[in-house]
Design a protein with these regions (language model features):
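Conserved, well-structured ligand/cofactor-binding cores
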Residues: 1-478
Length: 478
């Protein structure tokens, strides 16, 4: 006789929820609601990352501690929940979180997935059978909580902790690498470029100093994002009113989580804002997008400066990391910088998703939390790994091609800018055009036309002098 969905077999057990019975894998720690979510959402291969699962475990563990201290949960159940939640925090039970990212917009399936895993593991620790609900997923593990406040809180915790432990150290590594190159290249003068056209000289160290400052500002942006994420929804329960939650619950839970993560989290000043909108996630994603824009600019500049080896700009030499072509022998490409640009494109796209998610709030709840979480946390991870890789495998190994820098400066028609304050803008422009038509340098043409004494030309056409403020005052071009 064919088995129905509710009949058990040696490989399954039958669990019941408010919608009826369903077979669950016998060895699974998750339960019936997770099993329903697996059936309902066969959408993608995307799952919540480790940081989010860890954050869920942190909340549930702290909740058990606080509920016990408030006299709402007996010590036996609380201790079992805390031990099971610790296994979630440490990643031992990661395989028990199979729910797709594209699920219920509140993330209820993932909250119940967490509740069921901790419930069944805690029940097992107390000598009960999985599925027997000796420790109940709702009454005990989810006590004083709702998916509507737990999921947004977990997103904030995961993002804040990942920023602190991964992104800020990675950006600091990159900023220091760029700053070292700025000092190393400070004496090397090269041609500047605006609109991809020759401009007045600049020191290679000044360019790298600009890059270092961009990343320094990026670190500040991450800290601003952390501050925006510090207010969390926990304590608002279903719609922000705090129904079925002890008034001291949220503050005590967040004090524990803050201590364990090294990040500051506090109860939202207004729970209706914290649950009906996620402007803080949109803000944080926007900060990450800005960092991606900075990295895109830096990586593209590095690619251009290292283009060649014989027919490009060639002002710097990039580390050779791998063969660049399957058909052109000896070709080496700027693959690390290219990798960074693709990461930046992904982060910018992720920001669009987070923005759309932020718009998807109706009344008391935002209903795109899982996809907002996935994209935000992916952006943090990608920027972290790409920044460290960029620093170690590219920036640290860059060498300046000093001879190439010198030769390009002398060939530049923009050198005439230094003469404009003394001979006038129009005369300097004519000099540049004459030099271009004749194939001569500005220096050669200026000597030939005797626009100034040779001594004065030598002074004014000193490339180093052009990289510092001062000298005759006049229009510097546009």
């Amino acid at each position: 006789m064919k088995k129905t969905a509710t009949q058990s077999s040696p490989a399954t057990r039958v669990e019941r929820d408010t919608m009826g019975e369903l077979a669950v894998p016998a060895t699974a720690y998750y339960g019936v609601q997770t099993a329903r979510a697996i059936v309902n959402f066969p959408i993608s291969s995307l799952r919540f990352p480790r940081g989010m699962i860890r954050a869920m475990g942190l909340i549930k563990r702290a909740a058990a501690t606080v509920n016990q201290s408030l006299g709402l949960l007996d010590k036996k159940a609380a201790d079992a929940i805390k031990q099971a939640a610790t296994e979630v925090v440490e990643g031992t039970l990661d395989a028990e979180f199979p729910v797709d990212i594209f699920q219920t917009g509140s993330g209820t399936s993932t909250n119940m997935n967490t509740n069921e895993v901790i419930s069944n593991r805690a029940t097992e620790l107390l000598g009960g059978a999985r599925g027997s609900k000796l420790v109940h997923p709702n009454d005990h593990v989810n006590l004083g909580q709702s998916s509507n406040d737990v999921i947004p809180t977990a997103i904030h915790i995961a993002a804040g902790e990942m920023m602190q432990q991964q992104l800020i150290p990675a950006l600091t590594c990159l900023q220091k690498a760029l700053a070292r190159k700025a000092r190393e290249f400070d004496k090397i003068v090269k041609i500047g470029r605006t609109h991809l056209q020759d401009a007045t000289p600049v020191r290679l160290g000044q360019e790298f100093g600009g890059y270092a400052r961009q990343i320094e500002l990026g670190i500040q942006r991450v800290r601003h994002a952390q501050e925006a994420l510090s207010e969390v929804a926990l304590g608002g329960t279903a719609v922000g009113t705090g129904l079925n939650c002890h008034p001291k619950f949220s503050a005590r839970v967040l004090a524990i989580v803050s201590k364990e993560t090294g990040c500051t989290f506090k109860e939202a000043k207004n729970h209706f804002e914290a649950q009906s909108a996620q402007d803080s996630l949109v803000e944080a994603s926007g900060e990450l997008k800005t960092i991606a824009v900075s990295l895109m600019k830096i990586a593209n500049d590095i690619r251009w400066l290292g283009s060649g080896p014989r027919c490009g700009l060639g002002e710097i030499n990039l580390p050779e990391t791998q063969p660049g072509s399957s058909i052109m022998p000896g070709k080496v490409n700027p693959v690390i910088a290219e990798s960074v640009t693709m990461v930046c494109a992904q982060v910018i796209g992720n920001d669009v998703t987070v923005t759309v998610g932020g718009q998807a709030a109706n009344f008391e709840l935002i209903v795109m939390l899982p996809v907002m979480a996935y994209n935000l946390l992916q952006s943090i991870e990608l920027l972290s790994t790409a920044s460290t890789n960029f620093a170690v495998k590219c920036i640290d190994g860059i060498k300046a091609n000093e001879e190439r820098c010198r030769s390009l400066i002398e060939e530049s028609l923009a050198m005439c800018t230094a003469l404009a304050p003394e001979i006038g803008y129009e005369a300097a422009a004519k000099l540049a055009k004459d030099a271009y038509k004749s194939g001569k340098t500005v220096r050669q043409m200026a000597k030939e036309q005797k626009v100034l004494s040779e001594k004065r030309l030598t002074e004014l056409l000193d490339p180093w002098r052009m990289t510092e403020p001062g000298g005759p005052v006049g229009s510097a071009g546009g």
